[in-house]
């Protein structure tokens, strides 16, 4: 059913300075009031902004005060929420050292004792290595803790 229904998406709402959660919920209400069916919303990466950068597995609580309450409200409106996640982690990420300790990044081909650094949309970053069991296990752990446990199942794995 959802694969055939309308899925809203906008960078505008998640990029608001504050109360993005209320803005998205209001958008869903407006669409329904206009008689247009909506089955979900693809949540762009603004929810994960930390110090002006996209830092996944974090929540910007100025924009989304209570992720669990937000997802519960979306589910109550029968609008499945699909948050954006990305496979690159910026070097400035507040949990970057934790990720390094978990050995989750692609290795530098010239210096295999360390992770590789590449250009990412927000600056220098390292890329998650899904080919390693440690990488997959850590991805599952962080995704579950920060996104799935908040009340949604699908994610939009971008870039």
Predicted regions: what they are:
Residues 1-159:
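Catalytic-domain carbohydrate-binding cleft regions of carbohydrate-active enzymes
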């Amino acid at each position: 059913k959802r694969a055939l229904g309308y899925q809203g998406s906008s960078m505008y709402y998640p990029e608001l300075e504050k109360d993005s959660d209320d803005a998205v919920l209001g958008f869903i209400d407006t669409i329904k009031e206009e008689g247009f069916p909506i089955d979900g919303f693809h949540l762009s990466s603004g929810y994960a902004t930390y110090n002006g950068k996209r830092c996944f597995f974090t929540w910007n609580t100025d924009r989304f005060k209570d992720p669990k309450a937000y997802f519960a409200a979306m589910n109550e409106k029968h609008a499945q929420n699909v948050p954006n996640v990305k496979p690159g982690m910026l070097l400035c990420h507040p949990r970057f050292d934790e990720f390094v300790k978990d050995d989750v990044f692609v290795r530098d081909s010239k210096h295999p004792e360390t992770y590789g650094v590449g250009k990412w949309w927000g600056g220098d970053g390292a890329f998650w290595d899904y080919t390693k069991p440690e990488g997959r296990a850590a991805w599952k752990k962080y995704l579950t803790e920060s996104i799935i446990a908040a009340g949604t199942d699908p994610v939009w794995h971008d870039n």
